[in-house]
Amino acid sequence: MSPSERSVRFMLDIRYEDEALLIVNKPPGILVHPTTKEDETTLSAQISRYYQRQGWQLNLHPVSRLDRQTSGLVVFAKLPEIQGQLIKQGMQKEYLALVTGVLPARHGIIDYPIARKPGSIIEREINPEGKPCKTEYWVVSRSDRLKEIQPDTVAPYMDAGDLPADTVSSLSRQTPLSLVRCRLYTGRTHQIRVHFASIGCPLWHDNLYGNIPGPPQRHGLHAYRIAFVHPWTHTTIEVASALPEDLNRAWQNASQ
């Protein structure tokens, strides 16, 4: 077995698959799609090798995308018509985010338009001339260094059962961060990162929008839940992925 095949076996985490769709849990630090500078280490390339080993030649069509340093669920269609149907009908996408500071409300909606920042091909900004963007959030847990969260009040204002079982149970009892569940109503580039930075609560380790110097780091964002109506069967498909170990560890370390 080649090193690339070993990496696929280690990294490829398939959460759902049928004749039309593939949903994979992406780790942080890798691109979803190839670029001119990076090809073999991308998620798409690893999935292609996975199918090639089984003697299948598939052209996957992305339905959702994630930044390199964002982990979580990515949806691929195995047929272009499935891709088109899912994009047209839309999907319910939710994220778990570690945001710095304490949000002013336990539940809120951030509804600011976003546009590309002049002079940058990557960075976005709040701009009244930008495209409409809407993010709804619920605080799952919050505290500061002086206040300890008791076990029975980790999520008093939402049903913790909405989250994967191993998410809330492994959280630290004391932290300067806020764990937030986010629902996107639009899907703009860097939407969650820009929206929380705009209200003074940038994501943990987000050096693009959080004024943190240095090279890009793993930021506190995980695509944890996706739900949609299957284009063929018309049944509801819902897939979830718990907060990964590295973000749980960051949450715990922040309180020490």
What is the meaning of each model-derived region?
Residues 1-256:
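RNA pseudouridine synthases
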